[in-house]
């Protein structure tokens, strides 16, 4: 609703209900709509119930085992192996959207940490990371995946149930999109056909 209130921004949702859409199809929707920006919003999970915080990813090779493991879990429904994904990422890494995606990821991450810290003082800024997420592969535009809190952490799961907390997440993402938009000339986040 926040982005939709901006006359210079057209928002395209890949889904409006809680039904599964294949990861590749989400990116295909953005490409068909000729989107200028792709933001995939997720709630994180970990076997470590104490894990908490926010992290934002852009497409590239995984830089640490944790990022690779998270990408493998998120990608499981696609049926693609991590080795095959690494080959795809190598091809895509030549694309000039890498730097733009990193820049947008930094804006998203900074905004989430700043907006959520006042209501979740124990939040951890897990930083901007890179990993081969299927949902980001094939995007024709700068694209990021934001992990907005941990469902596996009881305290953060309870926060995610609160309207105010979700509104803060939305506000942080909204402001990141606007900041990114200001860095470019004549950008629209998505254009309708």
Could you say what each language-model-derived stretch is?
Residues 1-83, 91-98, 102-106, 187-193:
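Catalytic-core regions of hydrolytic enzymes
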Residues 47, 94-193:
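Active-site-adjacent mobile loop/cap segments within catalytic or ligand-binding domains
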Residues 87-90, 155:
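Acidic/histidine-rich, surface-exposed loop or edge segments in extracytoplasmic proteins
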């Amino acid at each position: 609703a926040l982005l939709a209130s901006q006359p210079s921004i057209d928002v395209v949702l890949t889904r409006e209900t809680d039904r599964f859409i294949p990861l590749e199809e989400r990116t295909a929707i953005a490409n068909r709509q000729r989107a200028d920006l792709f933001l995939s919003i997720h709630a994180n999970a970990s076997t470590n119930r104490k894990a908490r915080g926010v992290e934002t990813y852009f497409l590239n090779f995984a830089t640490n085992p944790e990022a690779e493991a998270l990408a493998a879990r998120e990608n499981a429904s696609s049926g693609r192996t991590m080795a095959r994904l690494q080959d795809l990422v190598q091809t895509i890494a030549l694309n000039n959207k890498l730097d733009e995606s990193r820049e947008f990821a930094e804006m998203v991450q900074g905004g989430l940490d700043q907006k959520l810290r006042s209501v979740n003082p124990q939040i951890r800024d897990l930083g901007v990371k890179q990993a081969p997420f299927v949902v980001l592969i094939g995007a024709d535009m700068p694209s990021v995946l934001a992990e907005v809190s941990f469902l596996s952490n009881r305290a953060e799961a309870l926060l995610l149930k609160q309207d105010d907390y979700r509104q803060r997440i939305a506000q942080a993402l909204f402001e990141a999109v606007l900041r990114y938009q200001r860095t470019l000339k004549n950008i629209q986040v998505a254009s309708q056909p």
